[in-house]
Structure formats: C-alpha cells, structure tokens
C-alpha cells in the first residue's frame, strides 16, 4: 500500500512539473503579417516550408532559443540557391505577437531590420510594433 501511494505521489509530482514548465511559442500555423509599406500578408509556417503571401520557401529552423529572457527562432530560408538568415523574435511573453527580422549579424540574431510584424490573432500594425518593441 505504501509503495502504491509513493508511486502515485511521484506521478502527481511529475505531472505538475510538466504542467508548470513554460512552453515555447510555436512558429507553425498561420500568422497575420504587415510590412513597412503597410502591405498585409498571410505567413504560414509548416514543418519545412514557409509561405509568404503566394510564395513558398524551404527553410530550416534552429530553436526555440532564448536571449535576455526573450524567445526567438533562427531561420535559414532557401530561395533560388541562396540561403538567407532570419529571426522570428517574440518580444513579450505572449505567443501571439512576433517580429520577423533580418539580423545584421548572425551573432546578434535579435538585432536587425524588421521585415514583418506578426500576430496570430489579429492584423498587426508594423509601425506600432516598431515603436513598442524595437528600442
């Protein structure tokens, strides 16, 4: 009986620990996006392809990673034989808001030119994201 209770207690502890672990935001799925020209897009991340508007690209992802308590993913997008590095950066604890960046330096992946404001639920405003999240 004691062994059974001890096993049950251990199981409950493991379940509560797993439930308490902070899950990383997911890239996969459809994102509402806006660029600097205020043009709206749908960006859809799948396992190894990303669709930006009507254009499909192959990509590889490294992450999630964290820096300065922020979560980000490093992407390598392949287009016409050329590979370009990008970062999808989550500037808050929210899993619905992200910035699509082209880093100036691969050693500083969360610093660079913002290409798109991303939001899972609603249409983002590029310039309000710049003002709010890029300091």
Where are these regions (language model features)?
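Edge beta-strand at a domain terminus
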Residues: 57-63, 103-135
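N-terminal helix-cap/turn-to-beta initiation motif at the start of protein domains
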Residues: 17-32, 123-124
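Sec-dependent bacterial lipoprotein signal peptides
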Residues: 1-20
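Short, flexible N-terminal segments of the mature chain
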Residues: 45-54
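Contiguous, well-ordered beta-strand patches that form the walls/edges
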Residues: 35-42, 55-108
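Short, low-complexity intrinsically disordered segments
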Residues: 1-2, 29, 131
